[in-house]
């Protein structure tokens, strides 16, 4: 069976989704969003905060900052 390569953004988003890590997302227009990733696909990220959901298109995202260190790969030390 062919092995599917994983993109870094998919590994990162899936890790913060599973661990429910709060994120700060900056958009290209300067808007700052905070919340927890509940789902994502190739084109967008579903962000939840205070019971409200926001669908954010990836092409509008400039920077993503997690609220705590993220260990994406086994054996990786979090410093």
UniProtKB/Swiss-Prot annotation:
Superkingdom of this protein's organism: Bacteria
Record's protein name: RNA-binding protein Hfq
Organism lineage string: Bacteria, Pseudomonadati, Pseudomonadota, Alphaproteobacteria, Hyphomicrobiales
Subunit and partners: Homohexamer.
CDD domains: Hfq
Family the UniProt entry places it in: Belongs to the Hfq family.
UniProt GO molecular function: RNA binding
Keywords assigned: RNA-binding, Stress response
Its biological purpose: RNA chaperone that binds small regulatory RNA (sRNAs) and mRNAs to facilitate mRNA translational regulation in response to envelope stress, environmental stress and changes in metabolite concentrations. Also binds with high specificity to tRNAs.
Keyword RNA-binding: yes
Any single GO BP term: regulation of RNA stability
SUPFAM superfamilies per the UniProt record, alphabetical: Sm-like ribonucleoproteins (SSF50182)
Membrane listed as a keyword: no
InterPro entries assigned to the protein according to its UniProt record, in alphabetical order: Hfq, LSM_dom_sf, Sm
Family matches, as PANTHER family: RNA-BINDING PROTEIN HFQ
Domain Sm positions: 10-70
Entries under Gene3D superfamilies matching the protein: 2.30.30.100
A single GO cellular-component term on record: cytosol
